């Protein structure tokens, strides 16, 4: 039986707009097990990104609990560094560092072995079709290539959970499929869970579970 890696329990997120209370998330629950591929769809403004931010300990819910069972870390910044991987549609690469250096940066911040980090990063970048561009600067890469570097960076610390917000939005269908295959590989080989927000319904239906976020709640789609 797979171990649970994330529990969102009775999560609510409310905002005030004048005298009106906007309920973005409303008593939402989600349990994520290791190795699961989860897709979340929903209309623009439905709260998908807010949900990812709360799950990733980047935002606090108005009510409810984010539980990460069996984590040996208590401080949020350490959980984010060692336990979680983040991918956004905007890649936020460091422009003065090569593709390879961008990918190994989280591993070096963690104080882990540089040689092993380079070997792992080279393998991931090669799996994403960037084996010949390890030493290119971000400005020398296309938008899709830059996004693949960002995806590789999210994987370098072998996180328990990857939180991906429209990770393939700027990618062509072939590269989108390569990204899915990489997610599938880390899920099956490393038991990494992936929670992905996407508007790509074809990609969403390839995942193990598909949820739709509507009126602040998640429902099986």
UniProtKB/Swiss-Prot annotation:
Compartment annotation: Cell inner membrane
EC number(s) on file: 7.6.2.-
GO cellular component: plasma membrane
Protein residues bound to ATP: 42-49
Domain ABC transporter, residue spans: 6-220
Gene Ontology MF terms in the entry: ATP binding; ATP hydrolysis activity
Pfam families xrefs: ABC_tran (PF00005)
Keywords associated with the record: ATP-binding, Cell inner membrane, Cell membrane, Membrane, Nucleotide-binding, Translocase, Transport
Membrane topology (UniProt): Peripheral membrane protein
InterPro entries per UniProt: AAA+_ATPase, ABC_transporter-like_ATP-bd, ABC_transporter-like_CS, MacB-like_ATP-bd, P-loop_NTPase
Protein family: Belongs to the ABC transporter superfamily. Lipoprotein translocase (TC 3.A.1.125) family.
Quaternary organization: The complex is composed of two ATP-binding proteins (LolD) and two transmembrane proteins (LolC and LolE).
PANTHER family attached to this UniProt entry: ABC TRANSPORTER ATP-BINDING PROTEIN MG467-RELATED (PTHR42798:SF2), LIPOPROTEIN-RELEASING SYSTEM ATP-BINDING PROTEIN LOLD (PTHR42798)
Role of this protein: Part of the ABC transporter complex LolCDE involved in the translocation of mature outer membrane-directed lipoproteins, from the inner membrane to the periplasmic chaperone, LolA. Responsible for the formation of the LolA-lipoprotein complex in an ATP-dependent manner.
Protein name, entry field: Lipoprotein-releasing system ATP-binding protein LolD
Source organism: Rickettsia felis (strain ATCC VR-1525 / URRWXCal2) (Rickettsia azadi)
Lineage: Bacteria, Pseudomonadati, Pseudomonadota, Alphaproteobacteria, Rickettsiales
